[in-house]
Amino acid sequence: MTIRPLHDRVVVKRLEAEEKTASGIVLPGAAAEKPDMGEVIAVGAGKIGKDGARRPLDVKVGDKIIFGKYSGQTVKADGEELLVMREEDIFGIVE
């Protein structure tokens, strides 16, 4: 199943969480925080402004991004957990 986001929405796959702390302590799955970084796997066509013109998104497929811990809506596609969020929920692109 492929998800094609609409308007200014973005589909993101979370990057794998760190399973060890900086001091080397291994965290069990429940204790590890969900990462706030991900990779963009699909983008919408852009938001339509008040003038009727479509504004393309600043992010593109393949970008690594940072977003808030509670950003987006979790969806499952082909057994994989993905996030669908608006572009405004993205803090920045990791370069």
Curated annotation (Swiss-Prot):
Main location: cytoplasm
PROSITE patterns (alphabetical): CHAPERONINS_CPN10
Source species, domain of life: Bacteria
Entry-linked HAMAP family: CH10 (MF_00580)
Subunit structure of this chain's protein: Heptamer of 7 subunits arranged in a ring. Interacts with the chaperonin GroEL.
Cited NCBIfam families: PRK00364.1-2 (NF001527), PRK00364.2-2 (NF001531), PRK00364.2-4 (NF001533)
Protein name (record): Co-chaperonin GroES
